[in-house]
Amino acid sequence: MAPEISVNPMYLSEKAHQAPPRRAYVTFLAGNGDYVKGVVGLAKGLRKVKSAYPLVVAMLPDVPEEHREILRSQGCVVREIEPVYPPDNQVEFAMAYYVLNYSKLRIWNFEEYSKMIYLDADIQVFDNIDHLFDLSDAYFYAVMDCFCEKTWSHSLQYSIGYCQQCPEKVTWPEDMESPPPPLYFNAGMFVFEPSPLTYESLLQTLEITPPSPFAEQDFLNMFFEKVYKPIPLVYNLVLAMLWRHPENVELEKVKVVHYCAAGSKPWRYTGEEANMDREDIKMLVDKWWDVYNDESLDFKSKIPADAEETVTKSSILASVLEPEMTYFPAPSAA
């Protein structure tokens, strides 16, 4: 059950003179690798479930123009953002590329939108979730994470065997000097309200916050701890839940699938990694491809055909390279 939530006043100070609400989904893209396929799949998935709202792609400057054109051709709103870096540190991130994910903080500066739903590029939406935009303001909504995979081996929860997904199985030891940690969300999907005040506070807080293994996810959990409200896991099924906590999963009811487990990215899937030969995983990968390959879900441009560029979407998609990521050095936050 969610704890008592105290409302963060910085959310409320800008509400008095707002224009009519404007809503959008938003995702993040960096580099010239194949994650663009994930964003294309997400855009088509949102169309399939008849979402009423656009998909904004917050992208770093190193995303090539050919990938930007792919996304424009799929009806995405392309927004370039500058990178955000944590303070200088020697921390070892759970994944090397996580340092780039601090740049997600820029989406709080998209003040033309009153509310947004963030979705990672390796997520697919299989049922309409537009109703989440109607959740009460002034809170941060996301799905609780699972601590059972080896990527959490650095954590106290993992060493104890404690997981918030089933706290009754392994309870928090009574002899621990500290109480159980606060509820912790997965930052691959969340509902939030852009705000210049929140944005500035995020950047200022980052400057004095030591980085940690899960990068911006740890940081956001710390920053929004007092206003976090958990939502059901149907809104962000982390695939490890299928083998770690199957009793908590009703797969037929899941609306949002997060292909974050090692080897589960549909556009790279081989079935060779651990747990990837499961029938439920194969089914979910096939579902993603069904959406991605469905040409009826391609964006129908309102621009006359003779005004469109001569480069076709199919020729651009065919040029997407194998995975490659441009990494930035990590200077102090700015």
UniProtKB/Swiss-Prot annotation:
Main location: cytoplasm
Subcellular location: Cytoplasm
Cofactor: a divalent metal cation
Family: Belongs to the glycosyltransferase 8 family. Galactosyltransferase subfamily.
Function description: Galactinol synthase involved in the biosynthesis of raffinose family oligosaccharides (RFOs) that function as osmoprotectants. May promote plant stress tolerance.
Gene Ontology terms: biological process: galactose metabolic process; response to oxidative stress
EC number(s) reported in the record: 2.4.1.123
One of the record's GO molecular function terms: inositol 3-alpha-galactosyltransferase activity
PANTHER family in the record: GLYCOGENIN SUBFAMILY MEMBER (PTHR11183)
One Pfam family here: Glyco_transf_8
Keyword Transcription: no
CDD domains: GT8_Glycogenin (cd02537)
Reaction(s) catalysed by this chain's protein: myo-inositol + UDP-alpha-D-galactose = alpha-D-galactosyl-(1->3)-1D-myo-inositol + UDP + H(+)
Induction or repression: By methylviologen (MV), a superoxide radical generating drug.
Protein keywords: Carbohydrate metabolism, Cytoplasm, Galactose metabolism, Glycosyltransferase, Manganese, Metal-binding, Transferase
Binding locations of Mn(2+): 120, 122, 258
Protein name per UniProt: Galactinol synthase 4
